[in-house]
């Protein structure tokens, strides 16, 4: 789905990934669930493009609902980038257990049902990745800037792409709680260190963007500082 010039979304408010389309090629941010491969093909076809036009995939972190088709892309020759602190997680799936937190039955069933329909149980770990660090500017379409956002995981990042006026935040925050169905900017569930995650939000406030794009929930149309204020004000 086209959001704006150069900017497209795969998936929906339950699980989303993003595509930046420029004349020099395509940059992907996150890889959703394995079944989002078909969504990717449809979006590429609508653009008159193919997997051969994808120059790189940046993962905001290493959780399974963000790496769905990453290994498939890697095997097709697309480099996969992730923060060094999440490289082990994306290669092995090993992560600390976190409390699930509040949940409501219908949103919970919707989340897991969507995962099953999108082949979540078939997610493959990514065998080879290129490790990145806070402040790196990647040689990919849009010159994406890596912004370290530790908390949800040690290697969680945001990805700032000025030409698209967008910052992709992964699970640094959410605009729809996948377990309760509550909408609006708020902390994301399944977070390793909630205090650190909230502290990391300060790193977004100075970024210039008109889109804040989470891995779960509707796109936020407005300044990063405004969404950070909304998260901090959430009950």
Walk through the language-model features, giving the residues of each.
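Conserved beta-strand hairpin/beta-sheet module of binuclear metal-dependent hydrolase folds
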Residues: 1-47, 51, 158-174
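Short, structured coil segments at secondary-structure junctions
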Residues: 3, 75-76, 208
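Residue-level marker for buried hydrophobic side chains located in beta-strands
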Residues: 27-29, 58, 80, 166-168, ...
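Metallo-beta-lactamase
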Residues: 33-35, 121-127, 137-139, 143-150, ...
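Active-site HxH/HxHxD metal-binding segment of metal-dependent hydrolases
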Residues: 45-130
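Short, electropositive alpha-helical surface patch
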Residues: 221-235
